[in-house]
Amino acid sequence: MAGKFTNMRYDNQAYNEEIRRSTDPLLYKLDSNYSVNCSPCFAAHGPIGGHNNSVAIGNQIDVDSVLRGVGRINSKSNQQQAPESLNQYTMYTPRECSPSLESHHSRFSHPAHDIRGLNVPDMRLGYPLHDPQCQIFEDFGVNTRLQAKDNHRAVWQQPMDQKSVYPKARPGREKNCTVSVNCTYAPYS
């Protein structure tokens, strides 16, 4: 049954419908503005209210091409180097999005080590509502590797007194240890 499809290839009407469906632009979507937000806003911290269709992105690509000069002929003529007018495109500045739509990272905004030290009443009533990221100050002009080397103070270790780990003499079995060395040498003959 290899090569068996629901519409046979020699069926000219089905073949023409398949070609038309695959080449007609955006006819498979009933509403081309289905994902366009009615009140768009500018989000400084992440993609909010973005567009997911080619209708809204097409004008942005055209403006981007005009600003980069992609559509112009590479020429030294002053007439060819004149910038194109952007008056044919409608431009607007969107309002800023509300702060409730900003992304929130619970692990970074509320680290677990802040919560571990709290007891139950403090957690319910007096939880310290501060942003730990606000206290971070990074001075990028300071070479921290050299600063760490300069501020390092060596900690010299003091050896432990090891007399406490020596074997103890058992009472009643004390014996003096003596070492004897035989120092007689055979004479050379």
UniProtKB/Swiss-Prot annotation:
Tell me which GO cellular component terms the UniProt record holds.
virion component
Q: Which UniProt keywords apply?
A: Virion
Domain of life, per lineage: Viruses
Q: What subcellular locations does the record give?
A: Virion
**Principal location:** virion
Assigned protein family:
Belongs to the mimivirus R457/R459 family.
The protein, known as: Uncharacterized protein R457
